[in-house]
């Protein structure tokens, strides 16, 4: 039996959240599972602890009981799965966690060093025309060149704050308001007019274990995130998409990011989700799989073969 903890948000939903499915599979294997909120993390006189609860998955909710002061260094495995925003509070947890000598999914230093919308910059041949800035004049010039762009906050997630700018839109006013709201640079990319090609690929140990096409169902919606209601469908990966998965997977494996999700649109790499990857529930649904079992098989293998 392994002693396992999940650092995650409390508002996860049974049947809709990958973290819950991973907890459920851990329970099925007989592991002891704890939950704690990131805000309960504390470095106390040389020891990293958290106010944690034993957790079990019920029919429609998680059940927390037996509150305890959990020494994280005595765990066998820790899942770092709280959602962005990727702010200084989030970053601070990665500085504290990287002191632990246990298996973490994912490596907190790697999470910190590879923000999800910046990581694709390491693969320039795969990304669409991209601008990262908080300069309104630079965004306006980018819009003037491409005429149809997508603007999104750099450190949020799940499609939050994403907007398309085209036609006679006041790009200056929109970008200025977004910079003020998010207090961070923005990502601007040329709009890819082929949202029917949007895919989520799940990588485990740097290799793709499943993919779905994400179909937009709402009229006028450009966001294909599963969190905002896109419908998953079966798909095949093209040669270029497999090349993207291979190259990204090589990088992720080299920095101990064991579990990740890749967003591909029109043959372009858009984002790499390393904080709280989702997608396995939808792949299970479409293909009748149980990927949480494959994930746990790999995590246990990684623990067994972990270098001292």
UniProtKB/Swiss-Prot annotation:
Residues the entry annotates as binding ATP: 143-198
Stored InterPro entries: ATP-grasp, ATP_grasp_subdomain_1, Glut_synth_pro, GSHS_ATP-bd, GSHS_N, PreATP-grasp_dom_sf
A GO CC annotation given for this chain: cytoplasm
UniProt GO MF annotations: ATP binding; glutathione synthase activity; metal ion binding
Domain ATP-grasp per the UniProt entry, residue ranges: 117-300
Keyword Zinc: no
Top enzyme category: ligase
Known catalytic reactions: gamma-L-glutamyl-L-cysteine + glycine + ATP = glutathione + ADP + phosphate + H(+)
Keyword Thylakoid attached: no
Cofactor annotation remark: Binds 1 Mg(2+) or Mn(2+) ion per subunit.
Pathway linked to the protein: Sulfur metabolism; glutathione biosynthesis; glutathione from L-cysteine and L-glutamate: step 2/2
Keywords assigned by UniProt, alphabetized: ATP-binding, Glutathione biosynthesis, Ligase, Magnesium, Manganese, Metal-binding, Nucleotide-binding
EC number: 6.3.2.3
Superkingdom of the source species: Bacteria
Binding site for Mg(2+): 271, 273
Cofactor: Mg(2+); Mn(2+)
Pfam families: GSH-S_ATP, GSH-S_N
Alphabetized PANTHER family for the sequence: GLUTATHIONE SYNTHETASE (PTHR21621:SF4), RIBOSOMAL PROTEIN S6 MODIFICATION PROTEIN (PTHR21621)
NCBIfam families linked: glut_syn, PRK05246.1
HAMAP family associated with the record: GSH_S
Family in the record: Belongs to the prokaryotic GSH synthase family.
Protein name: Glutathione synthetase
Organism: Anaplasma centrale
